[in-house]
Amino acid sequence: MTTVKTSPTTLPLHPLIHQLAEVIISHWQDYLDLSPYELPDGLGYVEGKLEGEKLVIENRCYQSPQFRKMHLELAKVGQGLDILHCVMFPNPDYALPMFGCDIVAGKGGVSAAIADLSPANPELTLSNSYNQALSQLETPNFSDQRELPEWGDIFSEYCLFIRPHTPEEEKLFLKRVGDFLKVHCQQANQSQPGSTQQREFNIQGQEYYCRKQQQNDKTRRVLEKAFGEAWANKYMTQVLFDIPNH
């Protein structure tokens, strides 16, 4: 079992990003049997320039029997933009949803915070066990709910997409993500591998999710400006949203 260091990064990031990274890593370590996941060469730590400012990307990747890849990305652009991005990709032998979480923070505070357990099957539906567990969670109220992107049909009814305006709302967001992770890890530990046909359905669901996420023009534009089109495409398709083998 892999032991993960307490602080996922040495980058000076927004406090909410540090706190969320620690929540994510601690849940992984507490509930799952982690082992290292090797990223393509040269993509674990990346430095570049974006409009004259230094861009640093740090990636942490693990795997477990139920998850083929658990990816935590932390990025900083100059002194004005901090980013957290996390996705847990299920082992396609298991019929599990996709946990995803992102935070974007600037000098004015957190501009976007999103978390979801997104269906990864052709029907785009969560299982009864997930619906039952998630429906029992306390639903927090936030003052600034944001609209999902046009390609956002991959998200579940439990998706949280907000702009937190107070420390209290930031704490509520942290708790919600922790609740999602606890449910997800507990459900994963109780799950059993499915049939060959179910595996194909699971792969189709992950592929649909990844293709939709690859349409995120904002992420692609930032990467292209800093590293060029070819590198950006490689990073989008091999690190951020890689598709499992059939």
From Swiss-Prot:
Catalytic activity: (2R,3Z)-phycocyanobilin + 4 oxidized [2Fe-2S]-[ferredoxin] = biliverdin IXalpha + 4 reduced [2Fe-2S]-[ferredoxin] + 4 H(+)
Organism superkingdom: Bacteria
One record GO biological process: phytochromobilin biosynthetic process
Pfam family, one: Fe_bilin_red
EC number: 1.3.7.5
GO molecular function, one term: phycocyanobilin:ferredoxin oxidoreductase activity
Keywords: Oxidoreductase
Top-rank EC class of the record's enzyme: oxidoreductase
Matching PANTHER family: PHYTOCHROMOBILIN:FERREDOXIN OXIDOREDUCTASE, CHLOROPLASTIC
Function statement: Catalyzes the four-electron reduction of biliverdin IX-alpha (2-electron reduction at both the A and D rings); the reaction proceeds via an isolatable 2-electron intermediate, 181,182-dihydrobiliverdin.
Family to which this protein belongs: Belongs to the HY2 family.
Protein name: Phycocyanobilin:ferredoxin oxidoreductase
UniProt organism field: Crocosphaera subtropica (strain ATCC 51142 / BH68) (Cyanothece sp. (strain ATCC 51142))
